[in-house]
Amino acid sequence: MLNTNDPAFSAYTQTRQAHWDAVAQKRDSWRGWGGTYHRRLREVYRYLVRPNQRVLEICAGFGDLLAALEPARGVGVDFSPEMIRRGRERHPAIEFVQADAHDLSAIEGPFDAIILSDAVNDLWDVQTVLEQARRLCHPQTRLILNLYSHLWQGILSLAQRLNLAAPMLEQNWLTLDDLSNLLNLSGFEVIRAWQEVLLPLPIPLLSTLFNRFLVRFWPFYHFALSNFVVARPQPEAVRDEPSVSVVIPARNEAGNIHAIFESVPQMGCRTELIFVEGHSQDETYATIEREIAAHPAIPSLLLRQTGIGKADAMRLGFAHAGGDILMILDADLTVPPQDLPRFYRALCSRKGEFINGVRLVYPMEREAMRPLNFLGNKFFSLAFSWLLGQPIKDTLCGTKVLWRKDYNSIVSNRAYFGDFDPFGDFDLIFGAAKLNLKIIDLPVRYRERTYGTTNISRWKHGWLLLKMVLLAARRIKFI
C-alpha cells in the first residue's frame, strides 16, 4: 500500500505538479509536432469508446481527448490546478476533479471506460493507480491505456530540446510486459495490445501510409511511438443461474428435429428453444410443430422466416429470445447439443464474454468437412486472428454464445459495419471485437451429417469470406 506521507513521494508529486502547471500555462501558444500525434490518438480512442458512455480519464490534462469521445458522463481527473482550470474553460460539459491519481476516493463510479493516456510512465506507483481505477469498474468496464515506447526516448528528448514536444520529467519507460504484469497484480486482465503511430509529423499521404497501414505489419510495429493496451477487470464467476435461449435456424432439417428435443440439456434456471424455419423444401416446419406438441415441458417457440439467409434467421430468433444468455445451435447437429453446457460454463465463469465454437482442433469424422473447406477455414482463421487482434481459430462454426446485453450492444453499434453479413457469424464476431469483448475459442468435435445435405455453397461462400476479410481490414484493422 502506498505511503502518502513518504517524503520522496511528496517531493515527486510537488515537482510534477509544478511542472505540469507550467506546461499548461504555455500550451495554448505552444506549437510543436504533437498535433498529428494527438489527432491520431483521438481517432483511435473514438474507435475504442462508443459515444454516450460513462468515461473517466485519469491524468486528463485539458480534457481534449475525453471531450472528443462525446461521453454521457465524462470525468477528468488531474492533480495540476492549472490544467483543471483551463480544462473547465475549454470543456464545460466535462466534470473536472483536481485529485492525485494515487487517491481516487472522491470519484464516484462505476464507469464504462477508464482511460490512462500517456500517463503511466509519469506515475510514482503505477500499481496503486491501477488499483484505484479497479475500484471504479463494473464487470464490463474497459481500461484503455497508451504509453510511449522506450525506443523513442532519445527522439523525444531531442524534440523537447528543440521545443517540438512538450517537456517531460524523468519517466518510468514501462514495457508492455511490465504493464501487463502490473495490470494482473492490480486485478485486470489484458484483452489485447498493439502499437500506433510510426510518423508523428503532418506529412500528407506519408502520415496516413505510416500511421494506418505500415504500423500494422512486422517489422514496422516494433518502431511505433505508442503502445496500446485494452484490459478488463479480472472475472468473477456468476453466482446465480442465468436463463438460456437456444436459437436454432432450420432449413431442410426435418430429420434432425426430434434429436434436438431429446438432446439439448437443461441449462441455468430455464432453457428455451427458439426454432427459426427458413423456406424448407421438406417437412421441417410441420415436424417442429409436432415435436413442440410432443414435448410440452420444454419451453419452445417456432418462427417462420420471412427474409433470406442464416443471419436474418438468427436476428429474428434473438429478437424473440427471453434468456439472459443467447446460444446458436445449427439444426444439422454437426456440433452435438450435449456440448452446450461447456459454452454455458465458459460464459458464466467469465473466462470469456463471447464464446466461439472451434471445429479445427480435434480430428473430424470422415465426411464432416471437405478438404478444401478445411483449408479455407484454416486460412481465414489466421487472417481474422490478425485482423481482430484476438485469436479466433474458426469463424464459421455455427455455435456461438454471448450475453444478451452484449448482443444488444452489438445491435446498437451495427451501423458501424452496415448490413454486410449473410451468415450472421461475422456480424457477431466483428461486433464483439469492436466492443473489445474477450473472445474465447472452445473446441468441439465436428460430426458428419446424419440427415440432409449441407446448405453451404463452397465457392460462393468462399468469395463472401474474402469480402469479410476486406471489410475487417477496412473497419477494424486499418482505422
Question: Where in this protein do the model-derived segments appear?
Answer:
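Hydrophobic helical membrane-anchoring modules
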Residues: 3, 211-244, 255, 259-266, ...
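Class I SAM-dependent methyltransferase SAM/SAH-binding core
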Residues: 61-103
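Short aromatic/hydrophobic "clamp" motif used to bind/position activated sugar donors
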Residues: 326
